[in-house]
From Swiss-Prot:
Residues 1-117 form the Ig-like domain. One of its GO terms (biological process) is immunoglobulin mediated immune response. This chain was isolated from an IgA myeloma protein that binds galactan. The keyword Ribosomal protein does not apply. InterPro entries: Ig-like_dom (IPR007110), Ig-like_dom_sf (IPR036179), Ig-like_fold (IPR013783), Ig_sub (IPR003599), Ig_V-set (IPR013106), IgHV (IPR050199). Pfam families: V-set (PF07686). It comes from the Eukaryota. GO terms for cellular component: extracellular region; immunoglobulin complex. This is Ig heavy chain V region X44.
Amino acid sequence: EVKLLESGGGLVQPGGSLKLSCAASGFDFSRYWMSWVRQAPGKGLEWIGEINPDSSTINYTPSLKDKFIISRDNAKNTLYLQMSKVRSEDTALYYCARLHYYGYAAYWGQGTLVTVSAE
């Protein structure tokens, strides 16, 4: 059974940093492209980026490429999202997804909530 478990979300102040993790199990993690996607409150899904199996190719949505870094550790079956310079509009549920060979998201995690607030 394919399982994806995100963690690392929480409350972060504007301008701060946060690192999300996604632990994968039930499949050969090292063979698959992986992706991060987010959904802000009341909004649709927004693709953040994707990484190929050996980390040689990483693609980002243009507006996020200067503040988010996607990486992976195949030995630990874990995908990462390093977030920096966060703003209130980065408040969202963050999901990792295993991509199908044809590019669509075949499996999703349950998500981890990131809230950006000064309070």
